[in-house]
């Protein structure tokens, strides 16, 4: 990914949306929390992603640390792609669906993009619908300026 000129904001947005909509897109999901004893903990796990209606959709066990952190605190950071072609997303929890509550289109869309169907993995799975607040994308140091593509939940023109 080295060489050439830095991509324009428009090209970065096109590339970012293509990555988000790609089949079997996986993201690193970073969350943090403070436990009852006052000890801070950070957690990083890989999860499958679906990009549905401009939202990041994850599926995980309801009792997982990641689901607990997201549902308790609302904030999450997602990392997609290798370090020399990365997309970083800061997002907030918009909705949690149990398997039987999930809209059919969301569940089907997730299964189609992620390549697996959480509805076949047990009743404790949850869909987490995340609204992106900030999206950044860059490849090399020459793309650090202008890396922010979305701010406050709105694409920057």
Can you say where each PLM-predicted feature lies in the sequence?
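Charged, gly/pro-rich active-site loop segments
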Residues: 1-11, 85-157
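Short secondary-structure boundary/capping segments
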Residues: 18-19, 48, 68, 118-120
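Short, basic/aromatic recognition patches
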Residues: 2-28
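A generic alpha-helix structural signal
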Residues: 17-21, 67, 103-111
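Short beta-strand segments
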Residues: 24-62, 68-70, 76-80, 88-92
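Generic structural signal for secondary-structure transition and capping sites
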Residues: 25-26, 75, 115, 135
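Short, intrinsically disordered, mixed-charge
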Residues: 71-76, 108-112
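Hydrophobic small-molecule pocket/channel-lining residues, especially in calycin-type beta-barrels
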Residues: 14, 21, 27, 79-81, ...
